[in-house]
Amino acid sequence: MNGLFLAGFDAGQTQTRCRLSRWHQNQWLPIAEGLGSGVIHLHASEGEERFEKALRSSFSKAVGNAGLRSEKALISAAAVGASGIEHDTPMQEQAQQLLARCLKIPSNQCLATGDERTALHGAFPQDAGIVLISGTGMICIGRNDQGKEQRCGGWGWLLDEGGSAQNLGQKGLQLSLRMADGRIPDRPLREKLWRALNCSSATAIKALVVQPNFGAAGFAQLAPLVVAEAQVGDKDAIAILEQSAHCIAEAITGVAQSLGLSDPKICGNGGAFEHLQPFRELIEQAIAKRMPTASWIKGQGDALDGALQLALRQLKLNPD
């Protein structure tokens, strides 16, 4: 089969996905996918080794699933989306060099970028639109008809993670400590959160959350419990959800205004948005209040499709 042989990667903390596809006669011909290990922040201890292992393992699996031998998988270009990779930074260059080394192709045929950009180019390959990712963290990014892109959020949970599962869990845990102090009446939320963390005192909570392996994911695991209490009428839990939804509406409005999108199409992604239905409803209500002409749509493709689109652009080709 003729055509360009391309690889797209979506690198996450738990796993990395690779999709192989051919671009032939102006259409995509999917070949195979593979799952590999997860990544951590590239500048963390063992970050580079974990990143390279994730790329190699997922690519090897995809090649095997395609019934090919690695020496026959001659990639024309590749792109990877991973959380925390900022445009035009040394980290982006480092990630691109690693991708090139893994696939044995020139670095100018590789692109490493944030997973929000691969999600955007997957959901809206050619059209204007905004992608929201509300999972452990939160970020949104949009593009207008002139091709200008604008991002909002995604600055890390220590600085700006309103609108995320981490934010819901952390605010809920803070609320539980106020209950333990007697500042507000004790309610079932405190007991449920502490039980989930296997803690029986405020001092145990304090010691737990500073452990290196707790972090954003540790708070995020508590989000469903906060949502559940909001559903049964806990007013403070409801307020946490409403404030977090407001943060998302604020970010999406900022992107839309910056790009001149008066009636933006929005595609929502991420575990908090997709699986915490009451939270999702509040997000939709908050955005409808700020931008009544906005509409929610299902994206044309996923982050791997977006990675393949960006890989093709490395060859100065566009799927038009």
Where on the chain are the PLM-derived regions?
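ATP-binding/phosphotransfer module of carbohydrate and carboxylate kinases, centering on a glycine-rich
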Residues: 1-71, 122-128, 175-320
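Conserved phosphate-binding catalytic cores of ATP/NTP-utilizing and phosphoryl-transfer enzymes
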Residues: 1-2, 107-131, 148
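Short glycine-aspartate micro-motif
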Residues: 6-10, 75-79, 129-133, 140
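Short beta-strand-loop/turn "lid" adjacent to the catalytic site in phosphate-handling enzymes
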Residues: 40, 59-102, 112, 121-124
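Glycine-rich beta-strand-to-loop/alpha-helix junction loops that act as flexible
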Residues: 79-85, 134-136, 266-274
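Glycine/charged-rich beta-loop-alpha catalytic/anionic-binding loops adjacent to active sites
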Residues: 100-105, 148-156, 286-295
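Active-site nucleophile and cofactor-binding loops and adjacent substrate-binding regions
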Residues: 109-118, 133-134, 295-305
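Glycine-rich phosphate-binding loop of actin/hexokinase-like ATP-binding domains
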Residues: 127-179, 183
